[in-house]
Regions:
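Positively charged, amphipathic and often flexible ligand-engagement surfaces
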Residues: 1-167
Length: 167
Protein backbone atom coordinates (compact mmCIF):
# COMPACT_ATOMS: atom_id res chain seq x y z
CA UNK A 1 0.00 0.00 0.00
CA UNK A 2 2.92 2.34 0.60
CA UNK A 3 3.43 2.69 -3.15
CA UNK A 4 -0.07 4.13 -3.60
CA UNK A 5 -0.89 5.68 -0.20
CA UNK A 6 0.79 9.06 0.25
CA UNK A 7 0.26 9.17 3.99
CA UNK A 8 -2.12 8.69 6.86
CA UNK A 9 -2.45 12.42 7.54
CA UNK A 10 -2.21 15.70 5.65
CA UNK A 11 1.43 16.55 6.53
CA UNK A 12 2.58 13.10 5.33
CA UNK A 13 0.51 13.49 2.16
CA UNK A 14 1.95 16.95 1.45
CA UNK A 15 5.51 15.70 1.87
CA UNK A 16 4.91 12.68 -0.39
CA UNK A 17 3.28 14.80 -3.09
CA UNK A 18 6.07 17.41 -2.95
CA UNK A 19 8.62 14.65 -3.54
CA UNK A 20 6.66 13.31 -6.50
CA UNK A 21 6.11 16.81 -7.90
CA UNK A 22 9.91 17.30 -7.91
CA UNK A 23 10.04 14.47 -10.44
CA UNK A 24 7.32 16.02 -12.60
CA UNK A 25 4.56 13.76 -11.29
CA UNK A 26 1.12 15.21 -10.65
CA UNK A 27 -0.91 13.43 -7.97
CA UNK A 28 -4.45 12.37 -7.25
CA UNK A 29 -5.48 12.67 -3.61
CA UNK A 30 -8.22 10.28 -2.52
CA UNK A 31 -9.57 10.32 1.03
CA UNK A 32 -10.09 6.57 1.31
CA UNK A 33 -13.53 5.25 2.15
CA UNK A 34 -16.84 4.36 0.56
CA UNK A 35 -20.37 3.08 1.23
CA UNK A 36 -20.98 5.40 4.20
CA UNK A 37 -24.41 5.01 5.81
CA UNK A 38 -24.14 7.60 8.60
CA UNK A 39 -24.65 11.35 8.01
CA UNK A 40 -22.03 12.35 10.56
CA UNK A 41 -19.44 10.10 8.92
CA UNK A 42 -20.25 11.60 5.51
CA UNK A 43 -19.89 15.11 6.92
CA UNK A 44 -16.54 14.17 8.49
CA UNK A 45 -15.37 12.85 5.12
CA UNK A 46 -16.44 16.10 3.45
CA UNK A 47 -14.57 18.15 6.07
CA UNK A 48 -11.44 16.04 5.59
CA UNK A 49 -11.57 16.56 1.83
CA UNK A 50 -12.04 20.32 2.31
CA UNK A 51 -8.93 20.31 4.54
CA UNK A 52 -7.00 18.50 1.81
CA UNK A 53 -8.10 21.11 -0.75
CA UNK A 54 -6.88 23.88 1.58
CA UNK A 55 -3.56 22.06 2.01
CA UNK A 56 -3.12 21.60 -1.75
CA UNK A 57 -3.66 25.32 -2.21
CA UNK A 58 -1.59 26.44 0.79
CA UNK A 59 1.42 24.30 -0.18
CA UNK A 60 1.01 24.95 -3.92
CA UNK A 61 1.39 21.29 -4.81
CA UNK A 62 0.44 19.75 -8.16
CA UNK A 63 -2.48 17.57 -7.12
CA UNK A 64 -6.20 17.11 -7.59
CA UNK A 65 -8.99 15.45 -5.63
CA UNK A 66 -10.64 12.12 -6.36
CA UNK A 67 -13.85 11.27 -4.52
CA UNK A 68 -16.41 8.51 -4.17
CA UNK A 69 -20.03 9.66 -3.89
CA UNK A 70 -20.95 6.91 -1.43
CA UNK A 71 -18.34 8.25 1.00
CA UNK A 72 -20.20 11.56 0.92
CA UNK A 73 -23.68 10.20 1.50
CA UNK A 74 -25.05 8.85 -1.79
CA UNK A 75 -26.51 5.82 0.01
CA UNK A 76 -28.13 8.12 2.57
CA UNK A 77 -29.83 10.72 0.37
CA UNK A 78 -29.08 12.09 -3.11
CA UNK A 79 -29.63 15.74 -2.15
CA UNK A 80 -27.53 15.40 1.02
CA UNK A 81 -24.72 13.90 -1.05
CA UNK A 82 -25.10 16.58 -3.73
CA UNK A 83 -24.74 19.37 -1.15
CA UNK A 84 -21.63 17.73 0.34
CA UNK A 85 -20.01 17.31 -3.06
CA UNK A 86 -21.08 20.77 -4.22
CA UNK A 87 -19.25 22.29 -1.25
CA UNK A 88 -16.12 20.32 -2.18
CA UNK A 89 -16.30 21.16 -5.88
CA UNK A 90 -16.98 24.83 -5.12
CA UNK A 91 -13.97 25.12 -2.78
CA UNK A 92 -11.79 23.30 -5.31
CA UNK A 93 -13.05 25.58 -8.09
CA UNK A 94 -12.03 28.62 -6.04
CA UNK A 95 -8.44 27.33 -6.07
CA UNK A 96 -8.57 25.93 -9.62
CA UNK A 97 -8.27 22.37 -8.34
CA UNK A 98 -9.76 19.55 -10.39
CA UNK A 99 -12.17 17.04 -8.79
CA UNK A 100 -12.51 13.57 -10.28
CA UNK A 101 -15.44 11.25 -9.56
CA UNK A 102 -14.42 7.66 -8.95
CA UNK A 103 -17.07 5.23 -10.09
CA UNK A 104 -18.32 2.53 -7.81
CA UNK A 105 -20.48 -0.54 -8.38
CA UNK A 106 -23.27 -0.58 -10.99
CA UNK A 107 -25.99 0.35 -8.50
CA UNK A 108 -24.28 3.72 -7.97
CA UNK A 109 -23.36 4.38 -11.58
CA UNK A 110 -26.38 6.38 -12.77
CA UNK A 111 -26.81 8.38 -9.53
CA UNK A 112 -23.12 9.33 -9.76
CA UNK A 113 -23.57 10.50 -13.34
CA UNK A 114 -26.67 12.42 -12.21
CA UNK A 115 -24.50 14.22 -9.64
CA UNK A 116 -21.94 15.07 -12.32
CA UNK A 117 -24.63 16.35 -14.68
CA UNK A 118 -26.12 18.58 -11.98
CA UNK A 119 -22.75 19.91 -10.80
CA UNK A 120 -21.55 20.60 -14.33
CA UNK A 121 -24.29 23.22 -14.67
CA UNK A 122 -22.22 25.44 -12.35
CA UNK A 123 -18.69 24.04 -12.35
CA UNK A 124 -16.11 23.14 -14.98
CA UNK A 125 -13.51 21.55 -12.70
CA UNK A 126 -14.99 18.04 -12.62
CA UNK A 127 -14.30 14.85 -14.48
CA UNK A 128 -15.05 11.19 -14.07
CA UNK A 129 -13.89 7.64 -14.32
CA UNK A 130 -15.50 5.39 -16.92
CA UNK A 131 -15.31 1.66 -16.21
CA UNK A 132 -14.64 0.05 -19.57
CA UNK A 133 -16.19 -3.31 -18.74
CA UNK A 134 -19.72 -1.89 -18.41
CA UNK A 135 -21.79 -2.44 -21.54
CA UNK A 136 -22.76 1.23 -21.43
CA UNK A 137 -19.14 2.48 -21.37
CA UNK A 138 -19.03 3.59 -25.03
CA UNK A 139 -22.21 5.64 -24.56
CA UNK A 140 -20.82 7.17 -21.35
CA UNK A 141 -17.55 8.07 -23.07
CA UNK A 142 -19.49 9.73 -25.88
CA UNK A 143 -21.70 11.65 -23.45
CA UNK A 144 -18.78 12.85 -21.31
CA UNK A 145 -16.17 13.24 -24.05
CA UNK A 146 -15.73 16.94 -23.26
CA UNK A 147 -14.88 16.15 -19.64
CA UNK A 148 -11.57 14.99 -18.30
CA UNK A 149 -12.01 11.20 -18.36
CA UNK A 150 -10.04 8.36 -16.84
CA UNK A 151 -10.84 5.04 -18.45
CA UNK A 152 -10.28 2.05 -16.15
CA UNK A 153 -10.90 -1.65 -16.31
CA UNK A 154 -13.09 -1.60 -13.21
CA UNK A 155 -12.51 -3.26 -9.85
CA UNK A 156 -15.97 -4.44 -8.85
CA UNK A 157 -17.42 -7.87 -9.65
CA UNK A 158 -20.52 -6.95 -11.62
CA UNK A 159 -23.42 -9.08 -12.90
CA UNK A 160 -23.46 -10.31 -16.47
CA UNK A 161 -26.56 -8.17 -17.12
CA UNK A 162 -24.50 -4.95 -16.89
CA UNK A 163 -20.87 -5.83 -17.57
CA UNK A 164 -18.51 -8.01 -19.54
CA UNK A 165 -17.28 -10.89 -17.39
CA UNK A 166 -13.88 -11.42 -19.04
CA UNK A 167 -11.68 -8.45 -18.28
Amino acid sequence: AQSVVAGTNIPEMIESVKQLNQHGISCTIDNLGEFVSDREEAIRAKEQILEVIEAIHEHNIDAHISLKPTQLGLDIDFDFCYENIKEIVSKAHTYQIFVNFDMEDHSHLQPSFDLIDKLSEDFDNIGTVIQAYFYRAVEDIEKYKNYRLRIVKGAYKEPEEVAFQDK
